[in-house]
Amino acid sequence: MTSIKNAELGWNEAGTPVSDQFDDVYFSNVNGLEETRYVFLKQNHLPERWQEFDQRRFVIGETGFGTGLNFLAVWQWFNEFRRNHPDAALKELHFISFEKYPLSLADLKKAHEAWPELAEYAEKLQKHYPAAVPECHRIVLEDGAITLDLWFGDIKDCMPQVPYNEQGLIDAWFLDGFAPSKNPEMWNQNLFNNMAKLAKQDCTVATFTAAGFVRRGLNEAGFAMKKVKGFGTKREMIAGSMEQREKQSNHLAWFNRTASSNLDSIAIIGGGIASAALAKTLVRRGQNVTLYCKDTQPAEGASGNRQGAVYPLLNGPHTGVSRVFAPAFLFARQFVEQAAQEIDFDHDWCGVTQLMWDDKSTDKLEKMLEGNFSPELIRKLSAEETAETIGLSIDMASVHYPMGGWLCPAELTRGLITQLEKTELFEAKFEHQVESLTWDEARELWTLNANGQNFEHSTVVVANGNEFQTLSQTEALPMGQVKGQVSHAPATKTLSKLKSVLCYDGYMTPVNPNNQHLCIGASYDRSHLDYEFDENAQRDNVEKLVKCIPNQEWTKEVDTSGNLSRQGIRCVSRDHLPFVGNVGDFETIKMQYADLQNQAEEEVEAIHQFPNLFCFLGLGSRGLSSAPLLAEVLASQICGDPLPLPVDVLTELHPSRMWVRKLRKGKAITEL
């Protein structure tokens, strides 16, 4: 992944931050907030347009985040709009912004001191301000009324990666940044063309500059721009709107993603962390959700463990795995912290330490470190630093995830479902095994057969983990199943000193003070897909610890002889990435794309997918780190909202990706 550098800045006599990279102020020395309101809010006709807006979500795009002043100002105005117009159709504000050199958190806080009236908003932003990790970071605020998608990286690289469909995405553009004379690399026709691609019809745009080449470039891109009075002593600025948008999308036909055409009622089949996170984000969007779970309560499957590690799955630079799991982990932190304000579940951000316990693991971790990840995310520790970090004697180097930790997935999942059941938009049907799905073309409804009863829904999401093969629409998905057994060991005086989750050829968690046990695991068994206790797995879990950390007496204190354990079956993919999105019609795709290798990209028809049927599967061992963000991805797709991952990363999550890859190579997919 391309490393992100924080902004280098100074502060002038007026206390205004000044960029060292661009030798320009971040906002006006005098009345910076009033200038923002005049240039970007008023010239985009806000809040007047909000009163007339007939959709649930209004989307603003901004070309330079900087200190976040524009975002904070529009957030303040939108909250006032919500208070004054509680019955308006518009309920949510979505702000998409780009920043090549993000401010450090310390500099951001200092800059925000200039606007005391925005302090309550600034503090909420600061709480979830992301580490300097490339690409999109979604921040959900005000229980979903405000969403910020903050893209870190060069705008010329990031903007084409923002997913959009034929209708466009942006309702209003804030064309902001350092002055064109200070940052000529940004202000060019490529930028204006990309703004047009993302714009909806009638999208407005405003910018502080009156430079002729900017006005002409925006006009050429399809906007109708004009000069208007500038703020204060500035004579002119320019503003306008999209005159005629060309219909286009940046989703490849064979990886097409479509929203649901009918959101009247959404069914989720499952009962684990994926289902709970998805239900929460859909209900937050005002959707009616019914959960169908085959068990007596949530989290009886793979999400039922006492302790699960939360840290990102990273590997070499520029891989789909790293580009999914780095932002997903940061969003999981946000999700967990927000959930902890409302429900009780055991968790501890104690860090995660991954040991370089042999040559192979050392080579793998050294290669991972070549990804130039932010030290806020991961850093290498010497043997001495490792021992100090974990609190136990050890003589090997490691990599440490300082923001990682552990949580109780069973308590989190059940807490989320219990919280949702208090709302009028959610219903859970336990002991309801969905045995079949049938699409009624005439009525455009799905019929779910469960326990001999039929239930009708307009949209269905299959999130039932290793049970995916029980439904004909998802049984062909190329996923595997792996049994895992986690062992529980009682605390000892020495083991209670462990201060970090420890990963090697297995993992061990610190002692949970609420039950005085730790977890050690987990086995991988593809041959026995049952939920029975396995003596060999119980023994192997301890033996792996002793093998990887030899000559340390404390490893011998891990006692699993009481046979305390838990079994689960993971749903896994070959490429370690989940399946999130529309469910493809396997039999039809085989015929539709039989000659795909010989077709030009522009000739390919959109992949055939079941109407209003989606899946959320294959989370493997990393559901705690990935489920919250991927739930956002899927809920956003279903509802037609902006998606929080780059468009080429979304292809790596497409449920039909493995079929398409084979077909493009001229290979048959009959044996998948």
From Swiss-Prot:
HAMAP family: MnmC (MF_01102)
Entry's Gene Ontology cellular component terms: cytoplasm
The EC number(s) this enzyme carries: 2.1.1.61, 1.5.-.-
Pfam families to which the protein is assigned, alphabetical: DAO, Methyltransf_30
Annotated source species: Vibrio parahaemolyticus serotype O3:K6 (strain RIMD 2210633)
Gene3D superfamilies: D-Amino Acid Oxidase, subunit A, domain 2 (3.30.9.10), FAD/NAD(P)-binding domain (3.50.50.60), Vaccinia Virus protein VP39 (3.40.50.150)
PANTHER family per the UniProt record, alphabetical: SARCOSINE DEHYDROGENASE-RELATED, TRNA 5-METHYLAMINOMETHYL-2-THIOURIDINE BIOSYNTHESIS BIFUNCTIONAL PROTEIN MNMC
Top-level division of the source organism's lineage: Bacteria
Cleavable signal peptide: none
Ranges where the record places region FAD-dependent cmnm(5)s(2)U34 oxidoreductase: 269-672
Primary role: Catalyzes the last two steps in the biosynthesis of 5-methylaminomethyl-2-thiouridine (mnm(5)s(2)U) at the wobble position (U34) in tRNA. Catalyzes the FAD-dependent demodification of cmnm(5)s(2)U34 to nm(5)s(2)U34, followed by the transfer of a methyl group from S-adenosyl-L-methionine to nm(5)s(2)U34, to form mnm(5)s(2)U34.
InterPro entries: FAD-dep_OxRdtase, FAD/NAD-bd_sf, MnmC-like_methylTransf, SAM-dependent_MTases_sf, tRNA_MAMT_biosynth_bifunc_MnmC, tRNA_MNMC2, tRNA_S-uridine_synth_MnmC_C
Keywords recorded for this protein, A-Z: Cytoplasm, FAD, Flavoprotein, Methyltransferase, Multifunctional enzyme, Oxidoreductase, S-adenosyl-L-methionine, Transferase, tRNA processing
Catalysis: reaction(s): 5-aminomethyl-2-thiouridine(34) in tRNA + S-adenosyl-L-methionine = 5-methylaminomethyl-2-thiouridine(34) in tRNA + S-adenosyl-L-homocysteine + H(+)
A molecular-function term among this protein's GO annotations: tRNA (5-methylaminomethyl-2-thiouridylate)(34)-methyltransferase activity
Major localization listed first in the record, in broad terms: cytoplasm
Cofactor annotation: FAD
Sections of the chain in a coiled coil: none
Similarity comment: In the N-terminal section; belongs to the methyltransferase superfamily. tRNA (mnm(5)s(2)U34)-methyltransferase family.
Ranges for region tRNA (mnm(5)s(2)U34)-methyltransferase: 1-243
Biological process annotations from GO: methylation; tRNA wobble uridine modification
Entry's localization field: Cytoplasm
UniProt name for this protein: tRNA 5-methylaminomethyl-2-thiouridine biosynthesis bifunctional protein MnmC
